[in-house]
Design a protein with these regions (language model features):
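Residue-level signal for well-ordered alpha-helical scaffold segments within enzymatic catalytic domains
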Residues: 40-44, 97, 101, 120
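C-terminal capping/extension of enzyme domains
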Residues: 4-12, 33-34, 80-96, 119-165
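Internal catalytic-core helix/loop-beta-alpha segment
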Residues: 65-113
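Structural motif
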Residues: 12-13, 106
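Short, surface-exposed acidic-centric catalytic microdomains
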Residues: 23-86
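Catalytic phosphate/metal-binding cores of nucleic-acid and nucleotide-processing enzymes, i.e., regions
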Residues: 106, 112-115, 124-129
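Short, solvent-exposed loop/turn segments at secondary-structure junctions
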Residues: 20-23, 36, 75-78, 112-115, ...
Length: 165
C-alpha cells in the first residue's frame, strides 16, 4: 500500500511520485533513499533547513507550511526493487478523494513514470493537466542538483507559499 497523502486545506499544488522505493518503505515516508535529492531540493526552494533523513515531521512541515501536497500515483503495484520499468498490476490512488479535501490547482509529477501513470489513470478523474518534472531519484544522476532546483523552482514558483504556520 502507498503512504497516506500529505496535505492541508491550504495545499494548492500536488507533487506526485510513482511508488515508494524499498528505502522509503523502510523509513515509512516519501523519498527515504539517502541519495534521493527531493528533500534537499525542497528545502532549498522553500528556504527551510534540510531535514534529517529520519525526521518525518520536519519533512511534512516543509510540504504543509508552503501550500503543497505530496502523494504517489499508485495505491499498489507489483515492482521489482525500485525499478519503475518493472511496475505492473497497477492500482491508482483515489485522487478524487484528495481533491475534495484540498484546493489543488496544479499537479507536478516527479519523473516520467509518475507522469505517464497520472496521465493514463488520474488525469481523467482530476481534469488537472500535470507538469512532468525531472526525477529526483538517484537513478537520474545525469540531472545535476542545480538543474533540479532550477527546473522545479521555475515550475513551483507560483505555488510555494510563504509559511504562515
Amino acid at each position: 500500500m502507498s503512504f497516506a497523502p500529505v496535505y492541508s486545506e491550504n495545499s494548492r499544488a500536488l507533487i506526485l511520485g510513482t511508488w515508494p522505493s524499498p528505502k522509503s518503505r523502510e523509513m515509512a515516508f516519501y523519498y527515504g533513499h539517502p541519495q534521493n535529492r527531493f528533500w534537499p531540493m525542497m528545502a532549498a526552494l522553500t528556504g527551510e533547513p534540510v531535514p534529517a533523513r529520519e525526521d518525518i515531521e520536519a519533512k511534512k512541515g516543509i510540504i504543509l507550511r508552503h501550500g503543497l501536497a505530496l502523494w504517489d500515483t499508485l495505491e499498489s503495484c507489483t515492482i521489482t526493487g525500485a525499478s519503475d520499468a518493472s511496475i505492473r498490476d497497477v492500482v491508482p490512488n483515489n485522487i478524487a478523494s484528495l481533491l475534495t479535501k484540498a484546493p489543488i490547482e496544479a499537479v507536478f509529477c516527479n519523473g516520467a513514470t509518475a507522469y505517464r501513470i497520472y496521465t493514463k489513470y488520474l488525469l481523467p478523474v482530476s481534469g488537472i493537466p500535470a507538469v512532468k518534472l525531472p526525477s529526483t531519484s538517484p537513478a537520474n544522476a545525469a540531472c545535476r542538483p542545480e538543474t533540479l532546483r532550477e527546473v522545479w523552482g521555475e515550475a513551483l514558483k507560483d505555488y510555494i507559499t510563504v509559511s504562515n504556520l
